[in-house]
Amino acid sequence: MNKRRLKKALRRLINLPGGIYFFLYIINKIRHFYLKAIKSTRVAYPSTIMLELTNQCNLACTICPREYDYGKAMDKGKMSVESAKKIIDELWPYLDSIGLTGMGETFLYNEIEEIVDYIKTKNKGIIISVSTNAVLPNFIEKVSKIVDKVDTIQISIDGLDDVYEHIRKNASFQELDRNLRLLAKITSNTNTDIMLNMVVTKENYSHMPTLVKYTEEIGIKYMDFTLLNLASVTNIDRSYYDFYQSSHFSYVLSELDDTINKTPSVLVTERNFRTDNNFQKCPYPWTHFYICWNGYIAPCCAKPFPKELNFGNVFNTKVINVLNDTSYKRFRSLWYKNITPDFCDKCHFVDLESIK
């Protein structure tokens, strides 16, 4: 566990639910470990969820599933405040964390502060994270309202300068840079961490070491690297993954490791590209449950398209009923057998060979 996650865990332990809710929380934890021990396909109430408040966005990024077949076919909209609160009411005694993010730009949801405040009234120890592209007009004004209320603001930065603008269509790197520097100052000495996230592609991978230096230069402490997931990118063949095996990619990874060692003020929280991949590496059948803006629970955040696959709608029944629906349990049974569902075709958890 890295320092950032340890800090969050300690904050959570200090602020566990009180009274009868503490016993509900503990009983649910015991149930979780019991079901895991007996290899059940059922799950306890979730300790973490992703709540997609909106799937609308101001950008058209080349790496985003919204820009391909599944994304173009999806219904677009935003979750009502009442629906979001209903989900929180049902789950809060069991939650350790909640991500207010999804296929859209979080700060297009005008009631974001109201939702954050509502979660905190339930239990101030619930860890809240949001993701953003940080280039909306008046972004600083919007984000300032939840600084010191949320625990992590993750910001997408898929390269620098022209490479960034090539990938993140309709975005300006100059505007992003200005907002990042301002936000770093605003969040200084608060309980809100800023973390930059880069999706590693053929077009930008050489920027990885430079991005660590840039993160240090603008006064941000955390950086994350993730690989491009082709599960929802319909017009790119899985052979795209081959470049991750190239000698030059390996060279840049070594350069990245060297830069990280020389930049102790920046903690790179995720860059583990070298593990073996198969369906059982995927955690999403069991955790980080994804609730779409229209109430459907999709299998994961990499392919959150209810028209392709969903296990039920939480607006029609309780969340726990959907999580333990027969179709969801059947999906989990494949995980135990390490049989990849057709839905997961091209996912990097499965089809990307371990990077040597």
Name each model feature, range by range:
Residues 7-152, 170, 174, 178, ...:
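Conserved alpha-helical substructure of the radical SAM core
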